[in-house]
């Protein structure tokens, strides 16, 4: 019986019709893709689909992957699927980055303590799916191992980190006997292939952050936006060089493509407190509450699911056509764009390997005119906030509606509709669903300060707030 490790890196990315490199690449030019890393495309025959999730451990899959350097060590959990029958020999590496997510000048031994063998995903960290219509292998790994008496994984420094998962080129094929726990090895001729990379942050609480979300007082932003105000109280930490060494990041709903960074304080109080309370650059569009649905039970369709059936041996889920939410704000409960994998059809069994996949059809009634040149996408945490061919909608002229069919794993999902130009230079998240100052959003604040003694950007403060 395989032992499954728990960790809180909840990863879900879109299920691909063809394989592609999965890595974090964001639109903010200040946050460049990590340097000195070469990616090679993954052949279609090797990997056909993904489910990726990342967050703190202890089952808190909805939280941002942020953990403290000292104190309560939550650890991390990495969980993802590869849609195939065979178990692969996978490894990971962890890279320390600066405030701009560029590789820092530190060597590995300076920022992490770990044994070489702990960088592997062995057979115990992989589980083939249980009698699902779409076969897959679920990979789950904890850092450190949950319940371990001796920590096998220790962060030595705070700051930004990137975790890369790569293929060693070894496949473990299951024997014909389904009850057999033995595996045979087949070595595949291939270079190291980086499958994806994800961001996380290790924090220190060296300063106190007091923050709030307010309605902007500027007329042009009052009805559709939200503003962050903040104080950084040093409590003895030397912030005297804040003008060049301090770096502040505001993030909306756990998205690294929705950030405001580089904000400077408006003034400094007598005790050294940095005050950020009148900055027009700290304004986010409020957006709207997310659309949501669940199909955790494949035998019962619950609104807004209209129909659940099977086609060519696979489950199909038809969602009720979405209304245009742009007209007025309506308060609804959501997960701020996130998702949860849930399987009510197999109680008591590990959901990571029991939940099935289904082709989910989205429909958006929309009267398109000659001026509509932008493409429309189904967008959310389920596909890592990416605009890809897999979540791009097609327009049905006869029915006057946008349509998309996306392969998803059983669970509860949030999503929205986004418009984008072909070159992605224009991205509009509010034209279809609207934007309102009342919308409930979650904001996270990261405060970095350059450490000259060790030559790296420390994360000296972290705060999560909601409006």
Tell me what each language-model feature is.
Residues 1-22:
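Bacterial Sec-dependent N-terminal signal peptides
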Residues 22-34, 190-223, 436-460:
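Low-complexity, Pro/Ser/Thr- and charge-rich linker/hinge segments at domain boundaries
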Residues 33, 38-98, 220-234, 347-363:
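Contiguous beta-strand segments within globular domains
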Residues 99-101, 167-178, 193, 300, ...:
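Short acidic/polar inter-strand loop motif in beta-rich domains
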Residues 115-143, 257-263, 268, 359-410, ...:
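Aromatic-rich carbohydrate-binding modules that target alpha-glucans
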Residues 133-168:
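Ligand-binding face of N-terminal immunoglobulin V-set domains in extracellular IgSF glycoproteins
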Residues 237-330:
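Long, internal scaffold/assembly segments composed of regular secondary structure
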Residues 318-372, 455-467:
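Basic K/R-rich, polyanion-interacting modules in nucleoproteins and related proteins
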